[in-house]
């Protein structure tokens, strides 16, 4: 039985209690119970019920059969040994629960056994030879348990020459175990015999006799021993071995090699400590430099002095020292801020592009800059006047951005974002023109009108083109009762900053709609291009005043 076909251990059978302590026996053994119903273990587990095992107590159980008190011992199924091995294995007698395993094992009549090892009863081949291992210090008996030649594997006792020859020919002695033709085996043995004869001429070798008849088994080349009567060779002594060793090189050669090596300059401990401290300081400054400072070369600052109100006096190139030349190539960081030089003082940032233009202004004073801005603004205003005004399809055109201003107004602020009506013109009236927003034309716009201290919010919702307002309302229910009208959905992104899902509508165009029906609020909002809604935001509750 191999380890791959091992079956799970089967627990000892449990009695089935039919009532009044009577146990039902069938076939000479107790009927097992279902282990997945009377215990808390899953159905795919083969463990017995610890609850049922604990009810027996001791080593047996007492029952009443025909009014007599009997003490019956638990027993395993009476099956033949072969059938018993088929459905239960002795490979394991332990269970998942240690306590239940001890109790169930104590009830069993069979002692606990070790797991059975797989027994391989393969028929031994008749041609297989058994070799006995012999050592050199054993007494030579002249006999062998091998079925082959008697002198094949007998080791010598104290013959160093024979031991040397055996170690020399020990590697090619074992041949392959698969079947080979008889002629091939004979030729290989002859070649081995010739090699041994050439290497060791004074030793006589004989080829094996039954090599062709013992194919397919472990083959060894026979090593003939010298006669026992031969005298062993004397072993070399320790003094002889020491005399045979080569002499070491003289001391003078080693000293000459040491003197020929050039003397390397050695750094003192003080110099090494100073160098390490300086390197650590520089590395720490480099790592801790500000990430907000520019990382370019110092030549980045050369063309920015023209924006200063009073340009500094630049030194001549020949007056610039080598230290400053090196400092200009270093990245801008905290390392070189201690250098005091006119070229490295604080700079003024260049002027930002005006009116959406990408050109850089190279003007020296503020008067020229103001004149340039005025000229650029006048050209833009003339271009807008030549264009046709947009069609007036609504009550009043209200857009996000104004692109023209009266001439008397300051030119320092090119873009003015306003949402209310244009201011009254001073002097000559200029028609107000509007452009589209940055993200295209918006169909609906929401504007915050007022914010109450109690948390209420007034929002003006205006249509920029025909269509719906873009938000939905629904009747809210709080604690099972109607609570009012709430915003249930916002479909336009332009309304999301002012209108939020869950905001309660209190007023619509100064009309109190709290408690009104949903249809009434819809009729109030419908048919209008702009509506003012007073909301109670759902984010926070109004403060108690």
Curated annotation (Swiss-Prot):
Instruction: Map out region (Disordered) in residue numbers.
Output: 1-162, 200-250
Q: Where is the composition biased (Polar residues)?
A: 86-100, 212-221, 228-244
Q: SUPFAM superfamilies from the xrefs?
A: PDZ domain-like
Which residue ranges traverse the bilayer? none
Q: Where is the composition biased (Low complexity)?
A: 109-128, 141-152
Q: Which domain of life is it from?
A: Eukaryota
Q: Where is the PDZ domain?
A: 458-540
Output the GO biological process annotations, alphabetical, semicolon-separated.
centrosome cycle
PANTHER family referenced in this protein's UniProt entry, alphabetically: PAR-6-RELATED (PTHR14102), PROTEIN CBG16414 (PTHR14102:SF14)
Name under which the protein is recorded: Uncharacterized protein C09G1.4
Q: Which organism is it from?
A: Caenorhabditis elegans
């Amino acid at each position: 039985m191999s380890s791959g076909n091992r079956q799970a251990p089967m627990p000892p059978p449990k009695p089935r209690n039919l009532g009044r302590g009577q146990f039902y026996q069938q076939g000479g053994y107790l009927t097992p119970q279902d282990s997945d119903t009377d215990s808390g273990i899953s159905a795919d587990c083969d463990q017995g019920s610890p609850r049922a095992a604990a009810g027996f107590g001791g080593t047996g159980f007492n029952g009443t059969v025909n009014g007599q008190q009997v003490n019956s011992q638990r027993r395993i199924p009476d099956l033949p040994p072969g059938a018993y091995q088929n459905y239960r294995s002795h490979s394991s007698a332990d269970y998942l629960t240690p306590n239940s395993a001890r109790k169930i094992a104590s009830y069993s009549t069979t002692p606990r056994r070790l797991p059975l090892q797989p027994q391989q009863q393969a028929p031994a081949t008749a041609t297989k030879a058994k070799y006995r291992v012999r050592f050199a210090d054993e007494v030579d008996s002249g006999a062998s348990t091998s079925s082959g030649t008697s002198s094949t594997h007998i080791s010598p006792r104290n013959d160093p020459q024979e031991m040397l020859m055996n170690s020399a020919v020990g590697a090619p002695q074992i041949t392959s175990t698969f079947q080979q033709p008889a002629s091939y085996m004979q030729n290989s043995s002859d070649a081995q015999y010739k090699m041994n004869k050439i290497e060791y001429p004074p030793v006589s070798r004989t080829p094996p006799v039954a090599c062709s008849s013992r194919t397919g088994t472990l083959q060894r080349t026979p090593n003939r021993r010298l006669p026992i009567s031969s005298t062993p060779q004397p072993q070399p002594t320790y003094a002889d071995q020491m005399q045979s060793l080569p002499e070491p090189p003289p001391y003078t050669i080693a000293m000459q090699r040491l003197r020929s090596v050039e003397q390397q300059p050695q750094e003192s401990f003080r110099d090494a400590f100073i160098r390490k401290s300086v390197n650590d300081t520089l590395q720490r400054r480099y790592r801790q430099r500000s990430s907000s400072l520019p990382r370019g070369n110092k030549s980045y600052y050369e063309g920015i002095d023209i924006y200063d109100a009073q340009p500094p006096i630049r030194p001549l190139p020949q007056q610039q020292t080598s230290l400053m030349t090196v400092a200009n190539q270093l990245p801008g960081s905290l390392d070189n801020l201690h250098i005091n030089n006119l070229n490295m003082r604080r700079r003024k940032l260049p002027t930002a592009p005006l009116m959406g233009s990408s050109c850089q202004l190279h003007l020296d004073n503020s008067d020229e800059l103001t004149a340039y801005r005025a000229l650029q603004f006048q050209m833009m205003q003339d271009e807008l006047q030549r264009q046709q005004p947009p069609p007036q399809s609504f009550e009043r055109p209200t857009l996000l951005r104004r692109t023209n201003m009266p001439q008397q107004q300051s030119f320092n602020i090119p873009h003015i974002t306003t949402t209310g009506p244009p201011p009254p013109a001073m002097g000559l009236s200029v028609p107000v023109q509007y452009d589209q927003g940055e993200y295209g034309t918006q169909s609906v716009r929401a504007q915050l009108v007022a914010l109450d201290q109690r948390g209420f919010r007034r929002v003006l919702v205006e249509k920029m083109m025909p269509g719906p307002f873009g938000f939905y309302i629904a009747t809210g229910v709080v604690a099972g009762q109607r609570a009012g009208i709430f915003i249930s959905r916002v479909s336009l992104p332009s309304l999301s900053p002012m209108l939020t899902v869950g905001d309660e509508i209190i007023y619509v165009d100064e009309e109190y709609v709290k408690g009104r029906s949903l249809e009434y609020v819809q009729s109030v909002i419908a048919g209008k291009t702009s509506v003012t809604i007073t909301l109670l935001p759902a984010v926070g509750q109004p403060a108690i005043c």
